[in-house]
């Protein structure tokens, strides 16, 4: 396994390979990610895949071998685009057949030098370039999007907020859903009562130990009810830590 490059000036460097570079930075140009981008805390560039196509029509796709609907992105074109930015950063392909994106993988990416992200289109990408360039296939959910650009934006937003100096309150990032293995507890703020619903008394008691206990109990309840898969993994990890 080759060593990953050092972060340039401590910055996370994302290169997005796409047929629609005008979609970037998009939402990544506003809020936390946009401010961090403007301040140089991370770097974003796009690569137009079509620039690496040959011939008068600059075709980036062709019909699927063996027949079938749709078109497939060509291995030679995609490979040239990938090779143009290959510097040792992980190469990711956003695809519904990929491994589900997890907070653990997001943290690992945030700790690295960056990522090269290929946005798929049409029926997919020729399998040979996936194998030949060792692309890591990542999915953001069990549903189909028009292309990988939206998925790439989701991934980068999740990564950027974990970069040093991006979030004003480090604790915020450490207590959110998935960081503890649990979904997040409920939140409340003023007014004290709204439409007959009051803030739970415990949250205004000033007893921080009791508040922490309440929040954990609520997080456990919500996770158990809504995400049995996460709850099972959480319980398994607790048993492992407890040596049971």
UniProtKB/Swiss-Prot annotation:
Its main location: cytoplasm. Keywords: Cytoplasm, Methyltransferase, S-adenosyl-L-methionine, Transferase, tRNA processing. S-adenosyl-L-methionine binds at residues 120, 140-145. SUPFAM superfamilies: alpha/beta knot. Its EC number is 2.1.1.228. GO terms for biological process: tRNA N1-guanine methylation. It is an enzyme of class 2 (transferase). GO terms for cellular component: cytosol. GO terms for molecular function: tRNA (guanine(37)-N1)-methyltransferase activity. Homodimer. Specifically methylates guanosine-37 in various tRNAs. Belongs to the RNA methyltransferase TrmD family. This is tRNA (guanine-N(1)-)-methyltransferase. It comes from Brucella canis (strain ATCC 23365 / NCTC 10854 / RM-666).
